[in-house]
Amino acid sequence: MVKFKLKEVKPSVFAVIVKNKYDRAMLFCRAQEYYESPNPNFKNKFFSIWDYIKWYSLKNNGFSYPFDWSGFNFPYEVAQRCYSVSKVENKYDELFKNILMFIKNKLKNNKGYIIGVESLKDDTYRHEMCHALYYTNSLYRGS
């Protein structure tokens, strides 16, 4: 069982707080790599998480993803697209689909942002919030 908290930290910005580094990385891996993977076989494509793990492992001499990344961020709409074409392959997919349903019921216009962090009190949180505010707040963007 993955222990997490879900909190709307700013209007339309949702933080998924997962203390366990491995669980956090695995929960966010599929949508994050769908959003901005450097490998065109995964970015904006349906992919098996097992194919991604194999590719990442070969590229990095082992599957170090949970140790390489501590924070995650992407637009809600991207995660929705990702999970609309991806089949559930593990408990993390199942949980993330449930998180998306919860967020969908909270959004007014289907536009939002999701961040994945260990806590709401560290540099990673502040960094991920910069991405979220840039996306959701025109005053923050300066436009």
Question: Which ranges hold each PLM region?
Answer:
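A metal-dependent hydrolase signature that marks the N-terminal structural subdomain at the beginning
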Residues: 1-112
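Active-site recognition of the HExxH zinc-binding catalytic motif
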Residues: 123-136
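Post-HExxH zinc-binding segment in Zn-dependent metallohydrolases
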Residues: 135-143
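Short pre-active-site segment immediately N-terminal to the catalytic Zn-binding motif
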Residues: 111-126
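Short, solvent-exposed loop/turn segments at secondary-structure junctions
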Residues: 22-23, 120-121, 139-140
